[in-house]
């Protein structure tokens, strides 16, 4: 369960849009507002700062339990996550300690926050670094690689959401004595409950190790 401020980009999950909200104010007050406001956002010719923020009239989305399903996109494969070369141009062996870094798309620790949910899809980039000591013969090089087993999945999620709060509208001339009016979300939206859906490209990387290759002459 979570609670966050509603945004205009969330309205599609409620079968609504900024035009839906503007039309509701037009029906209620008999004239079309210049702009509308939702929390810290405005739309059309809105008053700045948005009146919902200025007058403390928030609108929230309450999220329920997330339903998650996954689909395998590929069988587990050995992948090289990163590599570095230790080079010795001298005439005697040297021992080097250096880091090898692997950068890969990994969803193993992704967080299904509301901000990720509303975007529809996401992937998470992770970086792994390991240090290794390598002895390199004279006039040779040794390649050190970070390898791991990668399994790619597509994760589908659905999050029920309900909405409660206010929208605002500003008018170019006074309406019933005021330039600003507020309406409850129930009067502005086609519905105040829905399901946010999306996908996340998800790659599990496991059994990460560092491999030192054979020395090669320069």
Curated annotation (Swiss-Prot):
Record-linked Gene3D superfamilies: 3.10.290.50
Residues forming coiled coils: none
Location in or out of the cell: Secreted
Domain of life according to the entry: Eukaryota
GO molecular function, one term: toxin activity
Keywords recorded for this protein, A-Z: Secreted, Toxin
GO annotations of cellular component type: extracellular region
CDD domains documented for this protein: parasporin-2-like_N-term (cd21130), PFM_parasporin-2-like (cd20222)
Membership in a protein family: Belongs to the hydralysin family.
Main function: Does not induce flaccid paralysis when injected into blowfly larvae and lacks hemolytic activity.
Protein name: Hydralysin-3
Phylogenetic classification of the source organism: Eukaryota, Metazoa, Cnidaria, Hydrozoa, Hydroidolina
Protein encoded by which gene: Hln-3
